[in-house]
Amino acid sequence: MAHKLAFIGFGVVGQGLAEILRDKKEALKQNEGFEAEIVAISDLMKGSIYHPGGLDISTVLQVLQETGSLENYPERPGLIRGWDSIRTIKDTNADTIIEVSYTDVKTGQPAIDHCKAAFEKGKNVVMTNKGPVALAYQELSEMAQRHGAYWGFEGTVMSGTPALRMPAAALAGNDITEIRGILNGTTNYILTQMEQDGVSYEAALKEAQELGYAEADPASDVEGYDARYKIVILSNHVMNAPLSVGEVECKGITGITLQDIEKAKAEGKSWRLIAKAKKENGKVIASIAPEKLDAEDPLASIRGSVNAITYQCDLLGTVTLSGAGAGKIETGFSLLIDLISINRERQLISI
């Protein structure tokens, strides 16, 4: 039976997943027994369409590319237009909500309300929005469990690189006592350019903005706020240790000068913005701050916009994972992985 999907938000990431589902349709069916049907899309700017029998995804993508609006999706019997996000979640025949709306990370809204509306209806949610997971992890986890719904958010930390799923599956049985990571590609790109090309912070930031790595207002990245939300998610989900955003000390890279970079190079070291969470005396101490790393540190070799994370395990020792931390297809893939997890659980139940 095909999974019926409703997209809340349909920007770059949502369209990335839609392209994957279209292009890998037969491979997913053959290799995973996975079939999906997009029945609804509700986007604040692009419009809203719903058909219980499914939408033609190639037509959707073509219409958006040519006109930018779902209002130009062709009419057909049974097509419904204009439903808002909450009604789309509650009243469509979707069993899984793809939550990729534009959300205020400081409040987690409207994505938190979207999750609650879905869980109340017993519908699964997969998402890439950090805010709800960092700000309402316990509440939403309990709500999903109470209503028998799956809540997937792999893409909130390192895009499609499995920073959450890998430790849960492959490191099970270990006590993970510390997590250290380069969780923001923008800041790592800036520091790498300063180190390799000898340019100033300002010049490296400008280049990052021109390449699309950094926003016009780069504060979320360069002040460490983005990484702070991610380390909170890692602490709660991977270390099973409650941690709030306000408990994380946060210092960005704006104070790092070219002189600091050159001095570190002379010492055989490298500056990186490190997100850290460590268990101490029964609680977790977490911080975001620039650190001067020895060459032997596995995080010191991570350059450009790549992300990486190191898990300190009581049985296995140090394990480091690196990979893409952003990108249309990469983040779309993170949603696919959560959908495949739902599919595998469904297959186990059916057996």
Give short role names for the model-derived ranges:
Residues 168-229, 234:
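Conserved anion/nucleotide-ligand pocket segment
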Residues 102-121, 130-158, 162-167:
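Rossmann-fold NAD(P)-binding glycine/threonine-rich loop
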Residues 1-120:
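N-terminal glycine-/serine-/threonine-rich beta1-alpha1-beta2 phosphate-ribose binding loop
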Residues 8, 12, 16, 36, ...:
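Conserved active-site and cofactor/substrate-binding residues in soluble primary-metabolism enzymes
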Residues 2, 297-351:
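ATP-dependent carboxylate/acyl-activation modules
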